[in-house]
């Protein structure tokens, strides 16, 4: 039977243990390979300050690489009587290497250990989310260019308003995603700082080389103040959650639009049959369940920052077990958002648009502004032109001229998709993911 890392000469009540461990074993599986990476950097540093011999380091690194491979294969498990991922990794090392395995925790607490695990996990997941956002962005830009000349009604207050285009609609969500990358980039930069060496939040009497572990793990810098490093637990997750929520907000709005435009009363877009579901009683139904679930899941993600903030609310300086609860809402959120992004990209790619919407005369009044502007450009005062066209609409004598000429930046005739593409490319390049990727690869090859 495994012993707890903190175990004393008394037995813990099983119900207390069940309650305090909670779902930690399950959640810690997300962190397993990052716990290994953090340990590899930590023990390399320990050898450099004389707390491990070169021979001990070599044996530990070899075994940690084996454990990392087990994690990559999805075979890593936390045994029933083992408390968490940190205990499991140390137990596996001790079983293989004896007392050498017990040395890896010198100069480290589970507090800074889980902090570095969370940061390594999060920066990997942020990288993957950014990649999936880019895939959806590319689909939206492609559709925007494809349908840039196809007009559709624009709405305000859910009333027919002015001419828009499918080029504008698809392009608007592409630009929204480009802006969302700024929030994700800011969250990444705050995440990509090394907490190792802060121990339980008050540092260590060992002469730890924190810059060395920072470099080994590819962090941009470190959380310098050891007290602040511990205070960052929860704050980091909340900041990242806000960035995820921002992306989710774009998805939720887009999904709502798509559901509306797909319904028979609008008929602006059509989803392929394979992208819909049916009814058990109504044989004609083709429901946009994918977009409905994207909307619901995205709305759930938008509540994530508030959940984390409330768990952290009024906690003083230092570690508290409350923070364990953040794992349960934070760690799975990346899978949820990734799934939504993948489904959105797939269904946008398959979406067909109705190129003949404006054949319906019910949409003619939306060209009234075009007529007002034409009269004003010819010299009639704008208010007089507005009144004249309004009276024609009331009298039923208004005749819509559907040949519109919008040329300014970002309008129907000048989408500026090249500028939006450049914006996304600049925002993606600002992450500098390659530094972390190269550091991890190098660490694993030591």
Predicted feature descriptions by range:
Residues 119-126, 130-131, 145, 153, ...:
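Charged, flexible cofactor/metal-binding loops and thiol motifs
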Residues 55-60, 135, 184, 261-265, ...:
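Short alpha-helical "patches" and their helix-cap loops
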Residues 2-38, 99-100, 282-446:
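Glycine-rich cofactor/substrate-binding loops
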Residues 2-203, 208-214, 221, 277-278, ...:
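A helix-coil-helix interface module used to build multimeric assemblies
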Residues 60-61, 217, 273-275, 362, ...:
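A general structural motif at alpha-helix termini
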Residues 44-52, 168, 238-246, 371-378:
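Short, well-ordered beta-strand elements within core beta-sheets of diverse protein domains
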Residues 42, 63, 67-70, 92, ...:
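Generic, well-ordered alpha-helical scaffold segments in large soluble proteins
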């Amino acid at each position: 039977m495994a012993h707890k890392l903190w175990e004393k000469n008394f037995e813990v009540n099983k119900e207390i243990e069940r309650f305090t461990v909670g779902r930690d074993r399950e959640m810690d599986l997300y962190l397993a390979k990052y716990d290994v990476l953090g340990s590899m950097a930590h023990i390399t540093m320990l050898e450099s300050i004389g707390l491990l011999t070169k021979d001990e380091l070599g044996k530990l690194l070899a075994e940690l690489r084996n454990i990392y491979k087990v994690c990559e294969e999805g075979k890593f498990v936390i045994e029933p009587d083992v408390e968490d991922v940190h205990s499991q990794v140390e137990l596996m090392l001790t079983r293989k290497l004896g007392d050498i395995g017990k040395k890896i925790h010198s100069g480290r607490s589970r507090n800074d250990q889980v902090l570095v695990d969370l940061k390594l996990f999060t920066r990997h997941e942020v990288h993957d989310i950014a990649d999936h956002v880019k895939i959806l962005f590319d689909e939206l830009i492609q559709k925007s260019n494809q349908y840039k000349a196809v007009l559709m009604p624009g709405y305000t207050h859910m009333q027919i308003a002015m001419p828009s285009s499918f080029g504008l609609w698809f392009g608007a969500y592409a630009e929204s995603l480009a802006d969302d990358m700024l929030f994700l980039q800011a969250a990444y930069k705050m995440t990509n700082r090394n907490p190792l060496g802060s121990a339980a939040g008050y540092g260590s009497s060992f002469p730890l080389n924190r810059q060395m572990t920072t470099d080994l793990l590819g962090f941009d810098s470190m959380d310098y103040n050891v007290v602040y490093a511990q205070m960052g637990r929860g704050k980091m997750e909340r900041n990242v959650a806000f960035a995820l929520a921002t992306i989710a907000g774009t998805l939720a709005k887009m999904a709502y639009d798509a559901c509306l435009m797909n319904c028979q009363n609008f008929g602006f877009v059509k989803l392929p049959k394979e992208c819909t579901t049916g009814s058990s009683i109504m044989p004609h139904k083709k429901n946009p369940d994918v977009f409905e679930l994207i909307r619901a899941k995205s709305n759930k993600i938008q509540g994530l920052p508030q959940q984390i903030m409330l768990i952290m609310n009024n906690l003083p300086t230092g570690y508290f077990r409350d923070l364990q609860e953040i794992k349960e809402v934070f760690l799975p959120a990346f899978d949820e958002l990734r799934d939504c992004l993948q489904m959105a990209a797939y269904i946008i790619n398959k979406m067909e648009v109705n190129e003949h919407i404006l054949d319906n005369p019910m949409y003619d009044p939306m060209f009234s502004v075009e007529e007002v502007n034409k009269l004003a450009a010819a010299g009639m005062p704008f208010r007089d032109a507005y009144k004249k066209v309004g009276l024609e609409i009331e009298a039923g004598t208004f005749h819509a001229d559907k040949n519109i000429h919008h040329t300014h930046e970002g309008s129907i005739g000048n989408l500026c998709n090249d500028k939006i593409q450049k914006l996304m490319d600049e925002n993606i390049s600002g992450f500098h993911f390659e530094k972390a990727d190269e550091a991890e690869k190098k660490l694993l090859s030591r």
